[in-house]
């Protein structure tokens, strides 16, 4: 299990074009969303609609949001 809270994240692709390129720190996550602190504000982003670059535990991974949907405790990367 990998806890992504506190990890850096960047939105590489999303069904909402206004989110592409946004980056920040993951503050919280639910089964379907990330709560991200950007420079200016806190945004909620649907996982299933995006492609994300995540820096966690000294490594960078690029993942489709569909791989991140679900309960945190059941996720293995």
From Swiss-Prot:
Catalysed reactions listed for this entry: Endonucleolytic cleavage of RNA, removing 5'-extranucleotides from tRNA precursor
Gene Ontology terms for molecular function: ribonuclease P activity; RNA binding
Keyword Nuclease carried by entry: yes
Record keywords: Cytoplasm, Endonuclease, Hydrolase, Nuclease, tRNA processing
GO terms under cellular component: cytoplasm; ribonuclease P complex
Alphabetical list of SMART domains matching this protein: POP4
Family listed: Belongs to the eukaryotic/archaeal RNase P protein component 1 family.
Protein name per Swiss-Prot or TrEMBL: Ribonuclease P protein component 1
Organism: Sulfurisphaera tokodaii (strain DSM 16993 / JCM 10545 / NBRC 100140 / 7) (Sulfolobus tokodaii)
Name of the gene encoding the protein in the UniProt record: rnp1
């Amino acid at each position: 299990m990998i806890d992504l809270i506190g990890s850096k994240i960047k939105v590489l692709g999303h069904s909402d074009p206004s989110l592409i390129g946004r980056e920040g720190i993951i503050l919280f996550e639910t089964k379907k969303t990330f709560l991200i602190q950007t420079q200016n504000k806190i945004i909620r982003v649907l996982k299933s609609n995006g492609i994300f670059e995540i820096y966690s535990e000294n490594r960078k991974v690029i993942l489709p949001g569909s791989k991140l949907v679900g309960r945190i405790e059941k996720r293995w990367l």
